[in-house]
């Protein structure tokens, strides 16, 4: 049945009266209530709100994917204008018809790329499959187009990446592959669910500009779901604010940022971490806690130095980690990924050292090498005076009580077959620290500490939003009262209000228990809040390291300054010109076997502040 008369000629999508409910233990839970929206051709609509507010559920309903989770969807209308100008009612389409619509006319970039990519197929095969299905291209043509899309999303060595599997890429690389796949068929509507969450600020700036360029070329409508208000200010034309399943405010981006009317919108904007807010302060500071009922209420700030003088609890000396790449008829190792190259640093009890840098810079590999989840090629890792890089697995296990981790992808970290209570309790059972009622009480306490309810212990990971799953992972890491926590993008999936709560929780635990954090992040505003010291990584090497105040207020290395300049500002009237990198501005860290990377020489430029001296033949000199 034609619907063209029901949709304005400028609109590509119209939704009215959307209601989504789930049934759980005999009760109906309303996830979305009476949400309506319109999207014009070439327009970007940002949907913002806290974790669990219904943003992602709304997007899945538009893709007709939510019914498979047992949801009850009721909607007045859900009209889509396809690329061929035909207007269809999405709710009336059969599964077979929706398979032709998805990807070609309405595409989606999901929040967690590792769960969206097939682990048994190469990156090239997965992108090419979508191109063959919707464009009728041959296998060779599809692979050529897949390579072109990888080049467009600024992935270096794109030809080599085509033959790699998802697990061989960093989190940021996987997210860029997802974006390339979604854009490969040039859909009429693109739904982007936290597409830049896993990306560092420089790649984020490139991806946002790339989406804008493709949007203008194809007059594509974009629904951008995010918790990053800086991104909203940078990319959105209009904003829809969701709170507890309802649309509480909508308007132009200027209206929302400069004259918000709803208390929750005011709360969201007040909770946004601002780069430069720590100027003049040397120690980490809690985020101000703001409630929707009292948006002007800030808690007092009490600075307390938690760093314990004496011997470092963790020492790293000359750490090198490389990964072999096989090729040729005999599958020999011909090249290697130089993931981490000769880095050294110390971590003191009660200190937070942040590792920052672009995707693929070696931050996460450094954390995994310290946990012995990947083996280092050379170097020393000394924990509490004991060298652990050469310990056997049996001798290493007791030390794992003292070194815990929070990974970037929460869904991949939790067993989908077990309740979250079981997952949190598992470390206690393995190390013999709790059974029965005592362990259950500990689990309930941990869930409350990270902002969840004790009854959530009986639910499964798929029943939570991405932000809630990350909080569960944080609770599990705290279960054993560790001395060191390696937090790999621990708050990147959280909305701004919950992010502030979690950072405050980490700071509270540091004060109470003297925990040391190795905080791996691309969020410079959060790093500025939580850090005592900062180390900036580029292509596997540390190029600047020093006290947080020195690095942020007086960055010496050009790469550090580039990272600072790429941070989006949460104000649409303050767009800053940014240098957007071309693909050849991002050198590759893949080298021929036996080829050595020139070592970076660090110079002391201030108290505890070290900066790399650029080398003539080094990629750093081009910055």
Curated annotation (Swiss-Prot):
UniProt domain ABC transporter: residue ranges: 15-269, 325-564
One biological process term from GO is: peptide transport
- EC code: 7.4.2.10
Membrane-topology annotation of the record:
Peripheral membrane protein
Q: What molecular function does GO assign, one term?
A: ATP binding
Q: Which family does it belong to?
A: Belongs to the ABC transporter superfamily. Glutathione importer (TC 3.A.1.5.11) family.
- What protein am I looking at? Glutathione import ATP-binding protein GsiA
Query: Which species does the entry assign this protein to?
Result: Salmonella paratyphi A (strain ATCC 9150 / SARB42)
Q: Which gene encodes it?
A: gsiA
């Amino acid at each position: 049945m034609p619907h063209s008369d029901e949709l304005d000629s400028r609109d590509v999508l119209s939704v009215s009266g959307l209601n989504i409910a789930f049934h759980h233990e005999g009760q109906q839970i309303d996830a979305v209530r009476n949400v309506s929206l319109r999207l014009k051709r070439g327009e970007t609509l940002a949907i913002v709100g806290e974790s669990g507010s219904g943003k992602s559920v709304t997007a899945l309903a538009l893709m007709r994917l939510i019914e498979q989770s047992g949801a009850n969807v009721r909607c007045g209308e859900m009209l889509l204008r396809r690329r061929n100008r035909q207007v269809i009612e999405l709710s009336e389409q059969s599964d077979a018809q929706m398979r032709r619509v998805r990807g070609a006319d309405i595409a989606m970039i999901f929040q967690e790329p590792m769960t969206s990519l097939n682990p048994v197929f190469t990156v090239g095969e997965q992108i090419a499959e979508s191109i063959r299905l919707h464009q009728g291209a041959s296998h060779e043509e599809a692979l050529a187009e897949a390579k072109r899309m990888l080049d467009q999303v600024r992935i270096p060595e794109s030809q080599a990446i085509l033959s790699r599997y998802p697990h061989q890429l960093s989190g940021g690389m996987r997210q860029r592959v997802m974006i390339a796949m979604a854009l490969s068929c040039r859909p009429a509507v693109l739904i982007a669910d936290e597409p830049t969450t896993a990306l560092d600020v420089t790649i984020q700036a490139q991806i946002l500009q790339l989406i804008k360029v493709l949007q203008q070329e194809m007059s594509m409508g974009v629904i951008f779901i995010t918790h990053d208000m800086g991104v909203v200010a940078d990319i959105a034309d209009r904003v829809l604010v969701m709170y507890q399943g309802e649309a509480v405010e909508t308007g132009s981006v200027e209206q929302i940022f400069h004259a918000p009317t709803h208390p929750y919108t005011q709360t969201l904007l007040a909770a946004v971490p601002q780069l430069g807010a720590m100027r003049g302060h040397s120690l980490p500071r809690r985020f101000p806690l703001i409630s929707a009922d009292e948006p002007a209420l800030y808690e007092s700030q009490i600075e307390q130095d938690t760093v314990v003088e004496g011997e470092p609890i963790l020492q790293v000396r000359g750490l090198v980690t490389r990964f072999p790449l096989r090729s040729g008829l005999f599958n020999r190792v011909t090249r290697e990924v130089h993931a981490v190259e000769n880095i050294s640093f110390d971590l003191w009890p009660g200190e937070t050292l942040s590792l920052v840098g672009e995707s693929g810079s070696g931050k996460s590999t450094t954390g995994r090498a310290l946990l012995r989840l990947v083996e280092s090629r050379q170097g020393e890792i000394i924990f509490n005076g004991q060298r652990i890089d050469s310990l056997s697995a049996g001798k290493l296990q007791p030390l794992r009580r003292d070194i815990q981790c929070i990974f970037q992808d929460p869904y991949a970290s939790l067993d989908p077959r077990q309740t979250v209570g079981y997952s949190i309790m598992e470390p206690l059972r393995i190390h013999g620290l709790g059974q029965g009622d005592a362990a259950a009480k500990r689990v309930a306490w941990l869930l409350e500490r990270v902002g969840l309810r004790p009854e959530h212990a009986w639910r499964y990971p798929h029943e939570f939003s991405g932000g809630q799953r990350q909080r569960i992972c944080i609770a599990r890491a705290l279960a054993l009262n560790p001395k060191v926590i390696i937090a790999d993008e621990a708050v990147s999936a959280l909305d701004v209000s919950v992010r502030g709560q979690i950072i405050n929780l980490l700071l509270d635990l540091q004060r109470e228990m003297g925990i040391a954090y190795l905080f791996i992040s691309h969020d410079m505003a959060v790093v500025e809040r939580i850090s005592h010291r900062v180390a900036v990584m580029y292509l596997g090497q540390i190029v600047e390291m020093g006290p947080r105040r020195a690095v942020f207020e007086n960055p010496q290395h050009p790469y550090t300054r580039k990272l600072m300049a790429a941070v989006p500002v949460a104000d649409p009237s303050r767009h800053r010109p940014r240098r957007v990198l071309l693909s050849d501005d991002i050198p590759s860290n893949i080298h021929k076997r036996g080829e050595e990377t020139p070592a970076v020489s660090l110079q002391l430029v201030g108290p505890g502040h070290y900066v790399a001296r650029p080398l003539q033949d080094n990629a750093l000199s081009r910055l």
